[in-house]
Every structure is written in structure tokens, then in C-alpha cells.
Design a protein with these regions (language model features):
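Transmembrane helix-bundle core of multi-pass membrane transporters
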Residues: 10, 128-205, 232-235, 255-260, ...
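Single transmembrane alpha-helix segments in multi-pass membrane proteins
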Residues: 29-36, 44-95, 120-125, 274, ...
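Alpha-helical transmembrane segments within multi-pass membrane transporters and channels
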Residues: 97-137, 293-294
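Cytosolic-side transmembrane-helix boundaries in multi-pass membrane proteins
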Residues: 1-28, 32-33, 217-220, 224-231, ...
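Structural signal for alpha-helical transmembrane segments and their membrane-water exit/capping regions
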Residues: 26-43, 71, 143-147, 200-207
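Transmembrane alpha-helical segments in multi-pass inner-membrane proteins
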Residues: 238, 244, 254-321
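Hydrophobic alpha-helical transmembrane segments
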Residues: 17-25, 51, 59, 80-81, ...
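Helix-loop-helix "hairpin" substructures at the membrane interface of multi-pass membrane proteins
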Residues: 98-103, 112-117, 121, 169-258
Length: 351
């Protein structure tokens, strides 16, 4: 009896943890199904690394957007800012600029957009959708002004950086000729993973991170608890802009070229990844680890569609839209049932 009393009661999962668990389970279920049905590349670790290599910039953008969405906002300028950074940095380096100054330029452009968006939304209280939509159009227009023609990086040092790969032999595979092909990961993936860890720690351990959840859950309650709502919201957009700038630099490291349509649809893919990862559009609930698995889930869906023989781009859009609706409905049902159980438990305690 004493032993039972001493046992700690297991605390129920929070909404964020519950949705994260669901996302991870669905990702592994989908990837496992792909391995069983199609085999081939899905059986190799390189498939996962390719997913990361191709989506490192999206992971970074989605991390910034997750912060904004947790705070109850939205930022649809991220794709345009990423494209502007890519084109600006390529033109800068092709005209004698260094890699270091290009990196500073990328960060500076991202911070400028984040600063303007954050100020207008937080302190002038203009609707986030309107401001970031204007920011998206402005960034896309500026991208065209920077260069009407597609650009390719001619900087030798940056070309060498692009070719640099991190090889992991023990995760490789044996080719038909019997030689070992190591798994290869680009530098951009390392940057994306570092950003992911830093943002995760910030949201989990810092006062600012907890403030994002507070203002997203209920801004009035957060204000009464002493949270500076305007400043916290301002920082959410500032960080989103910063990460969009970093994402542009990583995108450039992956493609080595730029044009006016770079990162087209990145904002929609980032929003979809965040929602699939368990971030609520209403705010207050979300996690960048969930967003990371949201990106992987979205990429797996597209890979499955392509492997199935449906190579036309609209099939990927249709499937992505259907899966997004499924995840939104799933979140709604799970959280609704959870709320009813909590209400029922409170009623029983009152009795």
C-alpha cells in the first residue's frame, strides 16, 4: 500500500506533446509502408539524407514560421524573402563579394524584413496577413529588380563549399559492383539541424520562448501575467525574418543558382509542415521538432506520389492538400475529445 502511494502519478501529455507524438507515429508508419511496398531507395539511409539535403532551407524557414504561429500570428513573406536573399547574394559574390559578406547580407536582409513586419504588426497593430502579404510582393519585386535573368554562382570558394559533403560510411550501402557508397549530407543540413536545436531550446527553456506560447494561447492573460505582449510578438517576426535570411543562404548552397521564382510556394510548404507537425493556427500549441517531422512527412508523401508513377506536379499538390485537411481534422478531433475528457473529470471532482 505504502509502495503504491509512493509511486508518482504519471502526468498526462500536453497538447503539444500529444500532437507531436501523433505526427512522429504517422511519419514512421508512412515511411515504413513505403519501404514495404516500393523498397528500392526507401530502404537506404541515403533516402532520408536526400530528403534533408533537398529541404534544409524549408526546415529553417518552417522553424521561424512555427515561432510566429505559436504566438498566434502568420508570416507568408518567408518564400519571397528567401528568394531575394538568394538572388542578392549571388549577384554580390559574382561582383567580387566574399562568402562572409554574402552571409552578412543574407542575415541583414532577413532582419530588415523581420524588423519592419514586427514593428507594423506589434506596435501599429496592423493585421499580420496584410503586412506579410505586402512583404511577400515587395520581396518578389525586389528579386526581379536585382536581376531579371537567372544567375549562376561563379565564386570558386562558394562552389567548393557547395561540393563539400559530410560522409557517413556506416550508414551507406553496397553498390552492385561491391563497393561501399557512404551516406552523404550537405553542409546546409548541419546548419538546419543547429537552427532546429537552438530554436527548440529557446522555446523550451527561455522566458522569451514561453512568452510566445503565452501570447498565442491568450494574449490578455499573458499581459496580466506580466508578459510584454507587443515586444514578444515583435521578436517572433524578427526571428522569422532572420531565419528566412539564413534559409536563403542555405538554399543557395544547395542549388548554386538563382532566379525570380526561387522558393516559390515555400511559405505554403512551411505552413503545411508546421500544421502537420502539430502547430495550431490559433496559436499557443506547437513544437519545432514536430515541424521537422512535418517536413519529413510532407516530403515522404511527395516521394510516394512520384514513386507511384504520378509524376505530374498537380498530383503532389492534390495529395498535400488532402493530407493537410486530414491532419487539421485529426487535430480538431483529438483536441476536442481531450477537452471533453478534461471537462468531465472536473465535473466528477466537483461532485
Amino acid at each position: 500500500m505504502m509502495r503504491n502511494n509512493n509511486l508518482k502519478r504519471r502526468e498526462p501529455l500536453t497538447d503539444t506533446q500529444l500532437l507531436l507524438t501523433i505526427t512522429i507515429c504517422i511519419f514512421f508508419a508512412m515511411y515504413g509502408l513505403a519501404m514495404l511496398v516500393w523498397g528500392g531507395g526507401f530502404l537506404r539511409f541515403q533516402q532520408v539524407f536526400d530528403m534533408l539535403n533537398n529541404n534544409a532551407a524549408l526546415i529553417i524557414v518552417a522553424c521561424g514560421l512555427t515561432i510566429v504561429m505559436i504566438g498566434g500570428g502568420i508570416d507568408i513573406s518567408v518564400g519571397g524573402v528567401t528568394a531575394l536573399v538568394v538572388m542578392s547574394c549571388i549577384v554580390h559574390m559574382n561582383n567580387g563579394g566574399s562568402i562572409f559578406t554574402a552571409a552578412l547580407l543574407a542575415i541583414g536582409i532577413g532582419l530588415c524584413f523581420g524588423l519592419v513586419h514586427g514593428f507594423l504588426i506589434s506596435y501599429l497593430e496592423i493585421q499580420p496577413f496584410i503586412i506579410t502579404l505586402a512583404g511577400m510582393f515587395f520581396a518578389r519585386g525586389m528579386t526581379t529588380i536585382v536581376s531579371l535573368e537567372p544567375q549562376k554562382i561563379a565564386h570558386e570558394g562558394f562552389q567548393q563549399l557547395m561540393k563539400t559533403k559530410i560522409e557517413i560510411p556506416w550508414l551507406g550501402y553496397i553498390a552492385k559492383k561491391g563497393n561501399l557508397i557512404p551516406a552523404r549530407m550537405e553542409i546546409g543540413v548541419v546548419v538546419a539541424l543547429v537552427v532546429l536545436v537552438v530554436v527548440f531550446i529557446m522555446l523550451k527553456k527561455t522566458r522569451l520562448g514561453r512568452g510566445f506560447y503565452a501570447i498565442g494561447g491568450n494574449s490578455q492573460s499573458a499581459l496580466m501575467l506580466g508578459v510584454n505582449v507587443k515586444r514578444t510578438r515583435f521578436f517572433s517576426y524578427l526571428i522569422s525574418g532572420l531565419l528566412s535570411g539564413i534559409a536563403g543562404f542555405v538554399f543557395m548552397m544547395h542549388t548554386g543558382a538563382g532566379n525570380a521564382t526561387n522558393a516559390a510556394g515555400a511559405e505554403m510548404n512551411a505552413i503545411a509542415s508546421a500544421i502537420i507537425g502539430g502547430t495550431l493556427l490559433s496559436g499557443g500549441v506547437g513544437n519545432v521538432i514536430g515541424t521537422f517531422f512535418g517536413v519529413l512527412t510532407l516530403t515522404t508523401i511527395k516521394a510516394i506520389v512520384t514513386t507511384s508513377g504520378l509524376r505530374e506536379p498537380w498530383w503532389q499538390s492534390i495529395t498535400t492538400g488532402a493530407m493537410l485537411c486530414f491532419f487539421i481534422l485529426l487535430q480538431s478531433v483529438v483536441l476536442s475529445r481531450r477537452a471533453k475528457k478534461k471537462a468531465k473529470a472536473k465535473d466528477l471532482l466537483k461532485e
